[in-house]
Amino acid sequence: MDGGGSSSWTHVSKNLIERRAVKGCLLPTPSDVMDAAVMALKDVTENIVGQQLFSVDRTNALSVIHTNEVPESIIATAIARDTSRDYLREYEGAAKCNLAATDLSHDEMWEVVIKRYWRYLRESSGAEVVDRGAVGQATQSVLSVLLLQSTFGKKRLSKNPFKHKGPNVGYKSNLEDLRSAFTKIEKYMYYMRPNDPMTKSEDTELRLHELLAYVTTCYRWLLWFMDLTDAKVLRNIDKGPVITHGPRESRPPDELVRRHLKSGPAISAGTGVALTLSTATADALIVLLRMSVSWTSHSWKSNTHGVTGAIVAAVELVTLIHHHLQYIINTVFAGYVCWLDGGVENSYLNSALRSQGRFDHFVGKLVPIMATLSWANMEKGTVMWFKYALAKSIVCHGSPTQHYLTVLESIASKRTGACPPQGSTFGRNPSGFPGQFCCPPQGPLPAPPNSKTRGTFRRCRPGSLRSSRQLPTSPPSNIVSPRTNPAIEGSTAAKNVQGAETIQVRSSGEFNDCIWYINGAYPHQRSDSSSSDNSTCSSTETQYITLPSTPSPTGDVVYTNPLLGPDEEVDASPQPVDPMSDYSAPKNPDYMRPRSTLVEEVWQLRDSDYTPYMRPSRAGRSRVRVEDQTLEPSSPAGCNPPANSPENDSDDAAVDSPPISPEVVYGTFRPRAKCVYDQYGLTALAALSASRAKARRTRPGPTQPDVCRERDEESAEPRHDGFIRRTMSTTGPPRKHPDQTERVSSL
């Protein structure tokens, strides 16, 4: 028995220590900690992000793709299944909580908007506008109304900005189409993210380029729209500007839209990986183009309430578009910047940020900009998802990749204002990323082997650790550092008793906590006519114009040279753009390719006497052009004008119609691109372009009756030095009125 027991114990005790040490010791390893951290982040993230990001179908579809790309079919499926705006659940809840905390009625919100606009108009134009009381400080309620009301409010503040019922109904329809397009673009951006933020994704980069180019175009449209609105307001209240600048945006909307539709990043790439996105951005831009026609041609009510109603509706439209564009830029800063080549130094991102900074410089007194940190406090899901994705990627790769380190170094270089020193760049060791848990050693460091020097340790003085954490070199994990002294730097961060999220904004003239990503600080006054990237204090002289004591008969605003910066002469030149010029995009051969010039575009077939926006044609007359000493309206084949357009009338009706009063001048206005009233897709635009080019090449000559009729008209209508006089009625003698004479330039 003893021998058997001894033999049994010998066999059992052979690996007893090893087995107990392996199976019984629960000391966590670094891999255990990382796995637990990743799982904890995943549990938290799943509760606050859209469910489609963690759906089984998406996970299975991406598991068979061995690259860091997301096909458009997966994105389109997620967009179609998200019918309840699940992607915006957390952000929308925080926004509505902010609006509820304002405790303002409908009339009080109206007063907030109209007072802010009068103050902005007085400071931007110099007109003597008397409002009913000062606006006061930018409180939390005012900021919530100006930033969130137009997007998340229960109803619109101003429902009828125009004089007649028809334009108001059309404007409501356009507004609904615009909201739908914005939602589709935001959903696309939300669900297009790959799984690995530390690996380059070419398809995602191209989609980000398309979104950022779209942001640039929309901000330029907003500046044009504010020029139009301010001019019409001053004309309606019989005020003239004292300090006049050039137009803040010199290109009309149709050129801005054509430029993006023709040669945007997604179209120029020709790969088809962003076809759904390019269609969505094109739909939004075409709706903006239709709104340009509405606000240019339709009149307002002449009474005081009519003017203020139009102002409130215009501000609502501007804040709606501005909030949508801010969502795109803040989402890029929340994590999507890791897929941009060069990080924050990407040229498309810089162009979008410069457009936003220019908008803030001129319109910031009216519409503030939300700080990225405030946006992240409301949209917690995106920030949390990137933390989870980065932790999972570090576990898979073992260390940060070189691509991710390059993005971090681009952010660090913007913080310090220059490239980091040679020895301060981030390495692959996780200890090279300082955080809130980093601290100096609490004891002497051991001396290296075979070293004659002893390990020395000098304990830091009290408070030195805290001071070391307040150095300007902030951790690379924070995209934007919070302000340290809100009272001095002018930040607004108010807290309410209901626990709503606060909003931090930066007014235009104050110090910018995100100055590292805007190429122009714009610290000078708004009356300056240019900005410089090299000097934050240099500015050109304000141009003054002495206006007569009585307002001009036309009531138009007199502009001087365009208000541009020294580096914007090519991008925002007032000269007409070359029809075959390319999109002003970064020189990237991977995404830009030469385009064929064999097919003429729709916009190249303009009449020779077209006029830009805010300059309508003569009352009751269609634009004409001279061809072989004849006078005939231009009506291109394949494009039917609108129902209220003068081109719908026959030739006899155009001659026999009675004269129209000048009050309906804007009713006969039509845009330079005559086929933008319907929602044309990219395919329809290409087909329309080809058909018009073919019709122009095969245009038949005039028939014999037409020639006889033209000769009779030539003999009956005398010419005087390039002017052509046209009779509006055949029942009486020609009227000697200067408004019935128009200048027609020969082709």
Swiss-Prot record:
This is Tegument protein UL46 homolog. The keyword Cell membrane does not apply. Modulates alpha trans-inducing factor-dependent activation of alpha genes. It comes from the Viruses. One of its GO terms (biological process) is regulation of DNA-templated transcription. GO terms for cellular component: host cell plasma membrane; membrane; viral tegument. It is a peripheral membrane protein. Residues 437-484, 525-593, 611-665, 689-747 are annotated as: Disordered. Residues 528-540 have a biased composition (Low complexity). It comes from Equine herpesvirus 1 (strain Ab4p) (EHV-1).
